[in-house]
């Protein structure tokens, strides 16, 4: 799960009342019913997502009010949209069961799976703001699960153009080619998508889930990603070999509210693909691409320089899009996903994340990515990626806007930030980050270099055009390279994907009159050759700060549980040998030095002992005295001296006085002296007393 959070992003033109509208769009049916039946029989072994559960969390205190304030036209449009899809389902024979299940307790909208009605077309424009307190989404959770088809499940149509003009303009990447629409081969590429739209205070949240159905035709795989680009499609007329890549594509469109400054959005999107036994004995390479396009729009100034609150309309309506170079007409196009995920069958998943915001924060322009893959051998797939980012100037608020992307299990590798100052009212910066999980082997990342004055030392570069009031444009080169970055979500690191730790990508807008920023995330390249395994699902999520986002799905949980095998992790010694051989060599040199020092000390001690043993017999024979121990405190050397006669008498007297007989004799003598003195004192006292008595008698 990929979590994105935005802070400090508010919009002043939103209404006061909370409105929720559900709009479901469905494409037209352009193929014959027999072709659908063949495709259904060919894809019986393919495990696909059978239902999408969308839940939007709203404050409990306002849930009843939102349920009561739901406009009648929205409910009618919702019912008509589902009636249209039901009628399309009755016209087609595709056995793909899908149902939208919303939480009625939360949204106050009944589940549309059992409704029926005439076919209708939804208007693409957004709802006007209504009165009510201004509040943003607390959280939006989008989940995809594999469940059994219900008794009255909707049968969705496939291929062709969308009923909604928005989706027709936005879904250019997943158009089915004309070569497959003629029904010449039963194992062709089929497409079905679901588009829901929630309108709340002029802020729309949309989810589009297109999926590529892969059929089997004489054990050959056919892959189509773009109708307009001939290099991205493999026609059944030219069958591919067993080494060709098999691609499954899916995307999620999400436009979030700008009201809540501290909002967190969770997107959990899974893609189920068929897993077959390996056709060859040798292991293969498995690669997948995860692309994130985050677009921001300003909520302060419009194209004419007036605040959006004055015009009472979002800036996306006022700003028109245009490209410097390209062959597609983007007028009226509101979003182009630019998302593609490729899987080489029966191998572990390797993922690359390329996240770019070529537009200003909260502007009305969006990036366009065209990913083209070509077969270059057994296990080599090349990508030619071109980005045409068109940006507009926007007013930067005084407080620092912050965009944080949390991807569990990923960690920082490198951060490069470069801000360029152009005119007095414009600044443009670009942040390039390298993110990676614990793969088995990593290689240096090769980055895309933009057109213009680019230096080889910079990972990314921003251009500032000279026009002070017109929109600026960016155009990236389209080099043919081997996937610039990969990520290996192997089973040994799947536990870390469930933890809360992750990658945080923060882009703080510099202060100035107008600010534009580009945010690019690239993942280091990783290659792993092993037995076929099925990766865990690796969903991605758009952030609340940008206007639109795209997330790439992973495989379903049931496939991963039944097919995935544990991958052996590298030990510490093997990892050091691969990544830091110098560390091992230096450690070995230090150990050798320590051993040499120990041997030298032992030899020195032996020499000292030999010298002492040779000197001891000479000293003992010559002089008789004690030799002090070298480690003792008594390190002085005793000297030979002669004792005088007086000293000898004094010593003898001390010895004599300390004898017990002598001590006793001295004690008796002392007592006799005391007794004699006491007797003398008694006699003197008697004499004095007698004299006094005689004198008194005389008187």
UniProtKB/Swiss-Prot annotation:
EC numbers on record: 2.3.2.-
Keyword Transferase part of the UniProt annotation: yes
Domain of life: Eukaryota
Localisation per UniProt entry: Cytoplasm; Cytoplasm, Cytoskeleton, Microtubule organizing center, Centrosome
Record GO terms (molecular function): ubiquitin protein ligase activity
Biased composition annotated in UniProt, kind: Pro residues: 534-545
Region named Disordered: 107-134, 443-473, 528-569
Keyword Cytoplasm attributed: yes
Record region (ALMS motif): 571-699
UniProt-listed GO biological process terms: protein polyubiquitination; protein stabilization; protein ubiquitination; regulation of centriole replication
InterPro entries per UniProt: ALMS_motif (IPR029299), C10orf90_N (IPR041179)
Major site of localization recorded for this protein: cytoplasm
Pfam families per UniProt: ALMS_motif, Centro_C10orf90
Alphabetic keyword roster: Cytoplasm, Cytoskeleton, Transferase, Tumor suppressor, Ubl conjugation pathway
Required for interaction with HDAC1: annotated segments: 116-224
Main enzyme class: transferase
Entry GO terms, CC: actin cytoskeleton; centriole; centrosome; cytoplasm; cytosol; nucleoplasm
Annotated stretches, region: Required for interaction with p53/TP53: 48-116
Role: Tumor suppressor that is required to sustain G2/M checkpoint after DNA damage. Acts as a p53/TP53 activator by inhibiting MDM2 binding to p53/TP53 and stimulating non-proteolytic polyubiquitination of p53/TP53. Exhibits ubiquitin ligase (E3) activity and assemble ubiquitin polymers through 'Lys-11'- (K11-), 'Lys-29'- (K29-) and 'Lys-63'- (K63)-linkages, independently of the ubiquitin-conjugating enzyme (E2). Promotes p53/TP53-dependent transcription of CDKN1A/p21, leading to robust checkpoint response. Mediates CDKN1A/p21 protein stability in a ubiquitin-independent manner.
Subunit note: Interacts with HDAC1; the interaction prevents binding of HDAC1 to CDKN1A/p21 and facilitates the acetylation and stabilization of CDKN1A/p21. Interacts with p53/TP53; the interaction inhibits binding of p53/TP53 and MDM2.
Protein name: (E2-independent) E3 ubiquitin-conjugating enzyme FATS
């Amino acid at each position: 799960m990929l979590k994105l959070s935005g802070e400090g992003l508010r919009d002043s033109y939103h209404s006061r009342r909370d409105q929720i509208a559900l709009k479901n769009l469905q494409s037209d049916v352009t193929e014959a019913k027999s072709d659908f039946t063949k495709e259904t029989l060919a894809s019986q072994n393919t495990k696909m997502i059978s239902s999408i559960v969308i839940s939007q969390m709203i404050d409990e205190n306002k849930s009843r009010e939102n349920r009561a304030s739901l406009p009648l036209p929205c409910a009618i449009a919702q019912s008509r949209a589902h009636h249209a899809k039901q009628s399309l389902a009755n016209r087609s024979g595709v056995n793909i069961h899908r149902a939208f299940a919303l939480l009625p307790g939360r949204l106050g909208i009944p589940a549309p799976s059992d409704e029926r009605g005439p076919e209708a077309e939804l208007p693409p424009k957004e709802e006007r703001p209504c009165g009510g307190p201004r509040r943003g989404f607390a959280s939006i959770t989008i989940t995809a699960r594999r469940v059994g088809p219900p008794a009255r499940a909707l049968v969705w149509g496939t291929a062709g153009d969308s009923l909604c003009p928005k989706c027709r303009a936005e879904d250019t990447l997943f158009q089915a080619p004309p070569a497959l629409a003629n029904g010449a081969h039963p194992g062709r590429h089929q497409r079905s998508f679901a588009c829901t739209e929630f309108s709340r205070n002029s802020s729309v949240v949309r989810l589009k889930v297109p999926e590529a159905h892969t059929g089997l035709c004489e054990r050959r795989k056919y892959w189509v990603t773009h109708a307009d680009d001939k290099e991205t499609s493999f026609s059944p007329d030219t069958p591919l070999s067993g080494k060709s890549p098999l691609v499954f594509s899916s995307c999620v469109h999400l436009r979030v509210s700008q009201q809540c400054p501290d909002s967190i959005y969770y997107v959990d999107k899974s893609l189920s693909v068929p897993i077959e036994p390996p056709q060859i004995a040798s292991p293969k390479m498995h690669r997948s691409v995860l692309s994130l396009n985050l677009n921001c729009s300003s909520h302060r100034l419009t194209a004419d320089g007036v605040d959006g609150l004055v015009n009472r309309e979002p800036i996306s309506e006022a700003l028109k899009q245009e490209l410097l170079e390209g062959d597609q007409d983007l007028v009226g196009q509101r979003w182009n996903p630019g998302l593609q995920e490729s899987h080489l069958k029966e191998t572990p998943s390797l993922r690359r994340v390329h996240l770019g915001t070529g537009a200003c924060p909260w502007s009305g322009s969006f990036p366009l990515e065209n990913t083209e893959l070509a077969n270059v051998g057994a296990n080599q797939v090349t990508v030619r990626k071109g980005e045409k980012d068109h940006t507009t100037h926007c007013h930067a608020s005084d407080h620092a806007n912050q965009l944080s992307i949390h991807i569990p299990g990923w960690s920082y590798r490198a951060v490069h930030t470069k801000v360029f100052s152009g005119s007095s009212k414009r600044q443009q910066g670009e942040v390039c980050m390298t993110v990676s999980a614990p793969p088995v082997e990593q290689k240096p990342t090769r980055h895309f270099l933009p057109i213009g004055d680019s230096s080889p030392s910079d990972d990314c570069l921003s251009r500032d055009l000279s026009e002070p009031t017109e929109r600026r444009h960016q155009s990236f080169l389209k080099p043919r390279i081997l996937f610039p970055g990969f990520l290996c979500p192997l089973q040994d690191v799947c536990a870390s994907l469930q933890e809360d730790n992750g990658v945080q990508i923060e882009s703080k807008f510099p202060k100035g009159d107008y600010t534009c920023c580009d945010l690019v995330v690239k993942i280091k390249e990783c290659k792993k050759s092993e037995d076929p395994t099925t990766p865990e699902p690796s969903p991605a999520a758009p952030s609340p700060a940008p206007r639109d986002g795209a997330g790439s799905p992973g495989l379903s949980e049931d496939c991963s549980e039944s097919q995935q095998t544990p991958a052996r992790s590298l030990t510490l010694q093997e990892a050091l040998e691969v990544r830091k051989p110098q560390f091992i060599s230096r450690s070995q040199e230090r150990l050798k030095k320590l051993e040499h020092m120990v041997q030298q000390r032992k030899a020195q001690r032996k020499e000292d002992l030999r010298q002492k043993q040779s000197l001891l017999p000479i000293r003992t024979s010559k002089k008789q005295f004690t030799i002090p121990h070298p480690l003792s405190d008594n390190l002085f050397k005793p000297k030979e001296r002669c004792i005088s006669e007086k000293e000898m008498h004094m010593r003898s007297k001390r010895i004599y006085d300390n004898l017990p007989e002598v001590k006793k004799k001295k004690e008796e003598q002392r007592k006799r002296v005391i007794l004699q003195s006491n007797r003398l004192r008694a006699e003197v006292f008697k004499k004095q007393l007698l004299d006094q008595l005689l004198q008194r008698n005389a008187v």
